[in-house]
Structures are given as structure tokens and as C-alpha cells.
Amino acid sequence: MSGKRISREKLTIKKMIDLYQAKCPQASAEPEHYEALFVYAQKRLDKCVFGEEKPACKQCPVHCYQPAKREEMKQIMRWAGPRMLWRHPILTVRHLIDDKRPVPELPEKYRPKKPHE
């Protein structure tokens, strides 16, 4: 089960994808593509190593998205982000605040191993 922060991130991503799909001229005409992308984003959020303390994805030291999907999400966020302020102002402001949070330290099991001396 997701906490408040992860649930809010999922909602924000869903709203951004929906806005992009509905209004962006470059958007694919296939709704299944965006539904699959959202399902992928949800799985990534559910498995985030930082959990509820997660930084904004662009600030994160762990890139959990496949490169192609990461680029597509960046494109969607670049296009939809400024437009979100008018359609979903509270979500947008919360996202901007989250973006300013410091990046937490990487959990121990995900840190690179130090060579023995």
C-alpha cells in the first residue's frame, strides 16, 4: 500500500499524462500507450528505494526508469508541467515544494560497495 506522498505522486503523474494525451499535438493517438506508461510509472513509484522520503525524480540519484521511458516521461512533464498550474494548482504547488526537498541519503543496501583495503 502506498503512503500519502507516493499516492500524490501517482495522481500527479496520472494528471500530467492525461493532460498531455488530451491536449498535446505531438501525443500518440493510442490511449493504450499512455495507460501502459502510467502502469509502468506506478510500479516504479511502488518500488522506489526512498519510499515516502523520495526526492523528485529529476533530483534522484537512482534512475529506475528504462532510458526510453525516462525520456518520454521527461517530455510529458516538460509539456504538461506549466499547464498543470491552471488545471491542478494544488497538486502543482505540492510537486514544486517536493522538488525543493533535500535528497535523502541512499539506503545502505543500494550504496556502492567499498573495496577492502
From Swiss-Prot:
Return the InterPro entries for the record. Answer: Uncharacterised_YgbA
Top-level taxon of the source organism:
Bacteria
Recorded hits in Pfam families, A to Z, give:
YgbA_NO
Which protein are we looking at?
Answer: Uncharacterized protein YgbA
- Name the species this protein comes from: Escherichia coli (strain K12)
